[in-house]
Amino acid sequence: AETLLSLLDQPLLKLADVSNLTFRGLILEATRANAIEIRGGASNRIAGCLIRNIGNTGVVIEGGTGHAVVSSDVSDTGDGGVSLTGGDRQTLSPGGHFVENCHFQRLGRWSKCYVPAVAMTGVGLRASHNLIQDHPHCAILYWGNDHLMEFNEIHHIALETGDVGAIYTGRDYTFRGDKIRHNFIHH
């Protein structure tokens, strides 16, 4: 058996206005904060990584363009899996961030509501080909325009909450152009 105790209250990786970096095959665990934070920059990739036992969110991407989390496993977080924020709602310029071919499970150990596997805020973000399971609230939560959610498999969500959907948004008639298609949602 292994026991982990983290005293670290900062991200394990923190990128600010950095572009064109790929982190591949890393195991990131044991911080009380977010595992990875990317702010600004362009075209950074988190690929084939295992992100687990995190106090807050697995990956937080804010601003910049074209960042991606691909083929990675995110599990056992205190809050959510991946949070994407990008694009400009005034001009409808897309952010181009995406989460693809990832496996999310056992998230939201600390916070139970509104900490999805994938959160998308802004314009032109994508969640596709992901497996999302064993979650207390919604699997994908989005705000904004022109987002694409497709080919995701979602099961065993809303395990500890109610009044929620697998893919969820709400109460803003300006959220237009979003596409939800070809997802497999089951229990």
Describe the role of every protein-language-model region.
Residues 1-40:
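Extended, small-residue-rich solenoid/repeat segments and analogous flexible loops
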Residues 7-16, 19-30, 33, 43-56, 65-79, 93-108, 116-120, 171-174, ...:
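Right-handed parallel beta-helix
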Residues 11, 32-37, 55-62, 78-84, ...:
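Short glycine/acidic-rich loop motifs that flank beta-strands on beta-rich extracellular proteins
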Residues 15, 38, 61, 91, ...:
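Residue-level marker of regulatory loop/turn positions in helix-turn-helix DNA-binding domains and
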Residues 85-89:
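Asp-box/WD-like beta-propeller blade repeats and closely related beta-sheet repeat scaffolds
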